[in-house]
Amino acid sequence: MDVGELLSYQPNRGTKRPRDDEEEELKTRRKQTGPRERGRYREDEATAAEDADDDKKRLLQIIDRDGEEEEEEEEPLDESSVKKMILTFEKRSYKNQELRIKFPDNPEKFMESELDLNDIIQEMHVVATMPDLYHLLVELSAVQSLLGLLGHDNTDVSIAVVDLLQELTDIDTLHESEEGAEVLIDALVDGQVVALLVQNLERLDESVREEADGVHNTLAIVENMAEFRPEMCTEAAQQGLLQWLLKRLKAKMPFDANKLYCSEVLAILLQDNDENRELLGELDGIDVLLQQLSVFKRHNPSTAEEQEMMENLFDALCSCLMLSSNRERFLKGEGLQLMNLMLREKKISRSSALKVLDHAMIGPEGADNCHKFVDILGLRTIFPLFMKSPRKIKKVGTTEKEHEEHVCSILASLLRNLRGQQRTRLLNKFTENDSEKVDRLMELHFKYLGAMQVADKKIEGEKHDIVRRGEIIDNDMEDEFYLRRLDAGLFILQHICYIMAEICNANVPQIRQRVHQILNMRGSSIKIVRHIIKEYAENIGDGRSPEFRETEQKRILGLLENF
């Protein structure tokens, strides 16, 4: 085996499936050697067997000899061999660059150097097995050279670099050597890797299989880096990635794995990041998300992958609505009308649309959306969902508890924010049909009160055991217990009790009498409701200004005076 064969040898890394055309070729070969074909040569079978044995022996001798030569030639992967590999890479990169400058209009002159360059890039994949040696890639400026090649005139070379970077930044590999990973990620960030990747993305043609793979691997690099260093998401978005993702999502192309991946990376960039949420709003991203989701108002996703993309887009929208400026964009983009239509159509998108409405209306920033929701007859949509949880929600991955949480949160937001005629229309709903909605509210109250009492009993037992062991229950433990109680049902119970307090303060005697009547019938007490609301007020407004928190607490506690 000569040196050229060794250099061009590429081990099967097992990361990609065989392509469709390769599979077809394999099938064709199998067909060509089927029983009928073999039958034609039965007369020569004995002779062929003898020849085959001789050929087999000769082949085994050649393999053994080549194997011995390879063992002698092959160096173990250590610092020295990596340095040698990087040096070869730099030489080939420089030679290719030199020939391209010298013979810009004569590809034959530089094509061989390009193939050599591609070969050494493939060989460098072996470095991904030794993250402890990543520092050599930085110290010997290989990272800088690789980033430079992302702009290579030949997209085959830039795609090869993307493939290599994807493997070097594999999240499992990065965690094998934190020190090596930090050095590599620092160098990539300093070299503005995302900006260069986006420039390369702009010229890739996804109708070409290799270039579509290049897009997928580019997104994988971003995901890997974001998982290892979440703070780089802001810089990545500002370097053109967010704009490219939005453009790719709205491109008129059939749904594929790359569109799914784009939705996933978009959701990652927006997670807990107000700067990126604001940037998305400025780029008209709210409209893009609403346009993409509008497809699912009357049609369910056709595959599990398409459903996953839909959920990613809903998550991205919910994340954006955490920012008040995006609530206004959502309102102007007729997001409320779209979500209301989805609730009525009863498709898979309904559960996620409910979650979006919850995010759009919550807090004082949701006041405009609350008023508009009543104007578009949203009360006719939300109250049937309040009266009865849909049976099919389990099929779309939403629990009955999650559904009831969102509905009660929306009603609480409406009661908090509505004024004038819209508020009157809302309160009238609680008096319709012999106050059936008050009855349903009380039914939910006792349902989640029971769940809370079970959870509280368990937590009290745990606290007793801790004290008995002589340990102290610190603030962190108390916070953990409170979060457990919220998850067990306290969160929705607080909203239910808040709704009770609001409607009992509405100067509608019929509602107040019905609430007290049901509490007495069930042997419950107004004191329990008061206690839950006080606890709710004490914990409200986390992450907001002290002024808002104080004002909101006074307002909520004021409701108890006339309860």
Swiss-Prot record:
Pfam family, one: CTNNBL
Sequence motif Nuclear localization signal, location on chain: 16-33
Biased composition (Acidic residues): 66-78
Biased composition (Basic and acidic residues): 34-45
HEAT repeat start and end residues: 79-129, 134-176
Location(s) in or outside the cell: Nucleus
Chief location bin: nucleus
Modified residues annotated as Phosphoserine in this record: 389, 545
ARM repeats: 178-228, 229-273, 274-323, 325-363, 364-417
Annotated GO MF terms: enzyme binding
Disordered: region residues: 1-81
N-acetylmethionine, modified sites: 1
Motif Nuclear export signal (NES): chain residues: 130-140
SUPFAM superfamilies linked: ARM repeat
CC per GO annotation: nucleus; Prp19 complex; spliceosomal complex
Family annotation (PANTHER family): BETA-CATENIN-LIKE PROTEIN 1, BETA-CATENIN-LIKE PROTEIN 1 NUCLEAR ASSOCIATED PROTEIN
Functional note: Component of the PRP19-CDC5L complex that forms an integral part of the spliceosome and is required for activating pre-mRNA splicing. Participates in AID/AICDA-mediated somatic hypermutation (SHM) and class-switch recombination (CSR), 2 processes resulting in the production of high-affinity, mutated isotype-switched antibodies.
The record's note on its domains: The surface residues of the concave side of the superhelical ARM repeat region contribute to, but are not essential for NLS binding.
Name used for this protein in its record: Beta-catenin-like protein 1
Organism ancestry: Eukaryota, Metazoa, Chordata, Craniata, Vertebrata
